[in-house]
Regions:
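Core nucleotide-handling region used for phosphoryl-transfer chemistry
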Residues: 1-211
Length: 211
């Protein structure tokens, strides 16, 4: 398999996707006692896709952007699943859209406990970003706003599957410890997203010790 790299950095000055472990964050920054969106953390490959209002399409992995004529899981998912949905969005709203999510299935990160590696390749959306046409104003799709990925899929018609939604919950230390101490059968863990953009993960130690 030949991987033809187009950029060593993301287009539009994007940074790579990442969530810090809650244990590494000072307690006063965890926003304990506040409500947040909780989603299941899927064990796959992070991917970013961009379709500009002018029709330029970009397929990005965690660190690289790939040319559209190469063949790998990022471009396969991009062209077969993501691009058709983004083309409908751009046609309807005439705006550039950036989506981020997790590629799962088809042996991605295959190990003895990863249920997400089974089945066909899928794209599981967890972030939408909406830059202006001149790329000077960015709407980051914060939770609770009309740019958020749930609003885009449930209300505005973005035809992409999302990561599993566990719901809006009040975050406490016991809540975080519950997921940290969860058995491996429950999966990798959860991602917690607050309305101000704060986000972090709580991962199952049992899951990681059995990979």
């Amino acid at each position: 398999m030949i991987l033809r790299l187009l950029f060593l950095i993301f287009p539009l000055n994007l940074t790579k996707t990442d969530e810090e472990n809650w244990e590494n964050i000072p307690e006063h920054q965890l926003l304990l006692g506040q409500k947040a969106l909780v989603t299941r953390k899927m064990d796959g490959c992070s991917a970013t896709y961009i379709l500009t209002a002018g029709g330029e399409f970009y397929c990005c992995g965690r660190r690289f952007t790939y040319k559209n004529d190469c063949f790998n899981r990022y471009t396969k998912v991009g062209h077969e699943i993501v691009r058709p949905a983004l083309e409908k969005w751009v046609k309807k709203y005439n705006e550039t859209i950036i989506v981020r999510g997790e590629i799962t299935g088809h042996g991605v990160n295959g190990n003895k406990v990863n249920k997400d590696s089974k089945g066909p390749l899928k794209f599981n959306l967890f972030k939408t970003i909406h830059p202006s046409k001149d790329n000077t104003i960015w709407k980051w799709g914060l939770y609770g706003t009309q740019g958020h990925f749930l609003w885009c899929t449930e209300v505005l018609g973005l035809e992409l599957e999302t990561v599993p939604i566990l719901g809006e919950m009040t975050i406490t230390k016991d809540f975080l410890l519950q997921f940290q101490q969860a058995p491996k059968e429950d999966g990798e863990g959860v991602v917690i997203e607050f309305e101000d953009g704060t986000h972090y993960k709580a991962k199952s130690m049992d899951y990681y010790s059995n990979i």
